[in-house]
Swiss-Prot record:
Source organism of this protein record: Acaryochloris marina (strain MBIC 11017)
Family: Belongs to the bacterial ribosomal protein bL31 family. Type A subfamily.
Keywords from the named record: Ribonucleoprotein, Ribosomal protein, RNA-binding, rRNA-binding
Protein name per its UniProtKB record: Large ribosomal subunit protein bL31
A Pfam family matched in the record: Ribosomal_L31
Region (Disordered): 64-85
Gene name of this polypeptide: rpmE
Binding partners and assembly: Part of the 50S ribosomal subunit.
Top-level taxon: Bacteria
Task of the protein: Binds the 23S rRNA.
Length: 85
């Protein structure tokens, strides 16, 4: 048997919102759930290709590690500096 007063409140009619509109009703421990992607607009289920991530992985990597476009991969930017000295 479940112990009393230790379980979270259960909402059997919790509403799921995507882009401000209700897309489905589920059971949850929260009254409202806000999601960015659900099966109705996910590219795998709709068969369409949609870019969800606005910033590419390569650009994010370059920005994170402070690499500029001129340096490129493999440290080619540093080889020119050695030749100049």
């Amino acid at each position: 048997m479940a112990k009393p007063d230790i379980h979270p409140k259960w909402y059997p009619e919790a509403k799921v919102y995507c882009d401000g509109e209700v897309v489905m009703t589920v059971g949850s421990t929260q009254e409202e759930l806000h999601v960015d992607v659900w099966s109705g607009n996910h590219p795998f289920f709709t068969g369409t290709q949609k870019i969800i991530d606005t910033e590419g992985r390569v650009e994010r990597f370059m920005r994170k590690y402070g690499m500029s476009e001129s340096q490129g991969a493999g440290g080619k930017g540093n080889a020119k500096k050695k030749d100049e000295k």
